[in-house]
Design a protein with these regions (language model features):
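N-terminal leader/targeting and accessory segments in enzymes
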Residues: 11-114, 118
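Phosphate-binding loop of NTP-binding sites
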Residues: 82-86, 93-236, 240-243
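Conserved Rossmann-like nucleotide-binding pocket used by diverse enzymes
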Residues: 2, 27, 197
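Secondary-structure boundary/capping motif
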Residues: 24-25, 66-70, 152-153, 243-246, ...
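Single conserved hydrophobic/aromatic residue that forms the stacking wall/gate
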Residues: 1-10, 244-255
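Short, conserved glycine- and acidic-residue-centered signature motifs
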Residues: 2, 35, 123
């Protein structure tokens, strides 16, 4: 569990991060249900938001005028990634970080990140991350319900729930953030959860990943950046999981 003193430090980091974006431009790629709260958060904190989506204005329906009322500028249609210019670009979890539009934005000086990566940096409470080829959602939901049954305050996010960055300011050090993480979200993550759970590994999403090695390398990011005392839990009945999980001085649990 995180200490209250450390929690105050993280809360200041959240406020400082949002303050650092005030007056700057942030492009949010994807105007789905999950990204709308992120757009709202940024707009409320004085960020000039460019909300980008492949959908047309008609397809977005009421969401388009609602976002414009908040101050967001919309960049819609098939060319929504063309000439992407912003101080910060929040990529959607399902988008590879090496697509040409993002590489070009980086070359122009943009910081390309994701809502989840920023959340990991500023979260004041214990993060439990769950990944795997199958069973992620079920396992994530079970962990969250077990903690709630124990009287804990739990924030559910990642592939399920909503953007947790929006909740970070109200989180307490004794709370838990339980996060489902896909291989796409983990692909370029440089931080790992305090408790990492890998349900299993099997060939999956190879239409998007270059090969099985890249897919597994993405999954391994759930624990590769952990610190001493953090915990990683693996499924010992899954041969691929055991084969590819590298040894480490950090705590390891097989179940």
């Amino acid at each position: 569990l995180r200490s209250r003193g450390l929690g105050d430090v993280y809360k200041r980091q959240i406020q400082e991060y949002l303050s650092s974006l005030r007056g700057k431009t942030a492009a949010v790629l994807g105007i789905g249900v999950s990204n709308t709260p992120l757009i709202e958060l940024l707009c409320r904190n004085g960020v000039q938001v460019i909300a980008c989506d492949k959908k047309s204005r008609e397809a977005l329906g009421e969401r388009a005028p609602q976002l414009e009322a908040l101050g967001a500028q919309l960049h819609l249609g098939e060319a929504y990634l063309d000439d992407l210019r912003a101080d910060v670009v929040f990529r959607t979890p399902g988008m590879r970080p090496d697509v040409p539009a993002l590489l070009e934005a980086k070359a122009r000086g943009s910081i390309v990140t994701s809502e989840m990566e920023i959340f990991f940096e500023v979260c004041p409470c214990t993060i439990i991350g769950v990944t795997g080829s199958d069973g992620k959602t079920t396992t994530t939901s079970i962990i969250a319900e077990m903690l709630r049954a124990a009287g804990k305050t739990v924030y559910l996010g990642g592939n399920i729930g909503h953007p947790l960055l929006c909740d970070a300011e109200k989180m307490q050090p004794e709370d838990f953030a339980v996060v489902e993480l896909s291989s796409f979200q983990l692909l370029d993550m440089k931080r790992s959860p305090h408790i990492a759970v890998m349900t299993n590994l099997a060939p999956n999403h190879l239409d998007v990943h270059k090969d099985m090695d890249e897919y597994i390398a993405a999954k391994e990011n759930i624990y590769l950046h952990q610190h001493e005392g953090d915990i990683a839990i693996f499924n010992e009945d899954n041969d691929i999981c055991l084969l590819y999980t590298s040894p480490s001085p950090r705590d390891r649990s097989l179940s």
